[in-house]
Amino acid sequence: MSLRLTNTLTRRTEPFTPLKDGHVSIYCCGVTVYDLCHLGHARSYIAWDVLRRYLLWRGYSVTFVQNFTDIDDKILKRAAEKKCSMEHISEQNIEAFHQDMDALGILRPDRMPRATQCLDGIRALIGELETSGAAYSVDGDVYFAVMKHHGYGKLSGRDLNEQQQNADGRVADAEEARKQHSFDFALWKGAKTGEPSFPSPWGAGRPGWHIECSAMVREELGETIDIHLGGADLIFPHHENEIAQSEAATGKQLARYWLHNGMVNVGGQKMSKSLGNFTTIRALLESGVSPMTLRLFILQAHYRKPLDFTADAINAAATGWKGLNAALGLGNIYAEALNWPECKPLPQEVMQPAHSSTLEQCSEIRQHFIDALDDDLNSSGAIAVLFDLARPLRALANRLERGDTKAIQETAQLNLLPRWQLLVELANVLGLEAEKAAKLAPEGNNRVDENHIQLAIAARKEAKAARDFAKADRIRDELRAQGIELIDKPGGLTDWISS
């Protein structure tokens, strides 16, 4: 079986065939850099990191492009709040983004264009759309004429007649009268007093949100790409509008495969900054959740399905990772005692013509792993393979950690080295790597005073009820400094996790 992916555009799971044999072009919608990334971002970028790693492991060359939106209403609002420049907010959060992604072991994209660095391409694309009649200008603003694009709605499945006005939430009510149709969206926004602006044939202004990605895809990867990635919340309007703009300009298909990840939910609601129910990646890691625990938590659910963020789920992932980490670290820690001279991943070609029962088993295990990821990136199935592979390794590691030297002789006949090498190799495809053994904390230092936490949660709830949000934030920060991360849920309930 070859790799099969669920294509949002066709609503089918299809065999993946790249445009160019052996090479895959991928564009992933990046973040708007006005704040720190939350767990929803981690879910998206870990999922696509696994896609990229898997393609590379299977022998493809991959060009992976991911953008930064560094000019947007949210950035301008944050800059005004902080009394600093838009550039300062963008640079600060781009650096934070890199730090968070690096901490999670996410491979950096090959190229990361910024909207403000692609203005020539953006202006050129808007000009082409206006010349063809697909766009029109009104007093310094330029809009895309949705009704003139007959394929509009093919990605989201929406009918224009059923859509609400201002579906993208980015056009103010006062501007409605300027547009030919309420569904038309801005390609270029005329300059406003006090806001940064850039020159254009239509006057000073700045690009709309959707046109940025269309221009960057064309500039970095060409008119048609293999795979376009993003969260399910981007299907409409962002990706629908991308398709409309790009295909109206080029007459060619923008992307052959559209993949979308499901949302992270807290108490049945999507995690988002607008709802205030989000947890940043940084806060979660600072609370003591390890990067690999977070990866495992995210990958235990299929990328297209909703993912419920709960303390129990994080703690279960931490327990699972503890065992997997012990197995992965076996060859690093006990190589000399086990007389394993070559502690490197087993070459794939060795696995094919198996000459022993161990290698035959490894070959079968490898194929089970491939079958799982070929099935629309079934990461939970791939992780199940890792746990089965790790079981005897974890048992040996536990015995050695207890000082049981008999374990070496008793397991010698099992020939576990190829099994460990395969585990390291396959885990790396999922971005899971052994962590260094943590130093033991002094007696009593790692105990959690649950009564103290509950009292603090109650005090914070009272502060919020009294609208003393500064005090509520201070209590949260104090608990965070103690390694406790709070998780607010609907109905005024608060859960917590600890390191």
Curated annotation (Swiss-Prot):
Binds 1 zinc ion per subunit. Zn(2+) binds at C29, C213, H238, E242. GO terms for molecular function: ATP binding; cysteine-tRNA ligase activity; zinc ion binding. A motif ('KMSKS' region) lies at residues 270-274. GO terms for biological process: cysteinyl-tRNA aminoacylation. InterPro entries: Cys-tRNA-ligase, Cys-tRNA-synt_Ia_DALR, Cys-tRNA/MSH_ligase, Rossmann-like_a/b/a_fold, tRNA-synt_1_cat_dom, tRNAsynth_Ia_anticodon-bd. SUPFAM superfamilies: Anticodon-binding domain of a subclass of class I aminoacyl-tRNA synthetases (SSF47323), Nucleotidylyl transferase (SSF52374). The keyword Lipid biosynthesis does not apply. CDD domains: CysRS_core. It catalyses: tRNA(Cys) + L-cysteine + ATP = L-cysteinyl-tRNA(Cys) + AMP + diphosphate. A motif ('HIGH' region) lies at residues 31-41. Its cofactor is Zn(2+). Keywords: Aminoacyl-tRNA synthetase, ATP-binding, Cytoplasm, Ligase, Metal-binding, Nucleotide-binding, Protein biosynthesis, Zinc. Its EC number is 6.1.1.16. Its main location: cytoplasm. ATP binds at K273. It comes from the Bacteria. Pfam families: DALR_2, tRNA-synt_1e. Monomer. HAMAP family: Cys_tRNA_synth. This is Cysteine--tRNA ligase. It comes from Prochlorococcus marinus (strain MIT 9303). The gene is cysS.
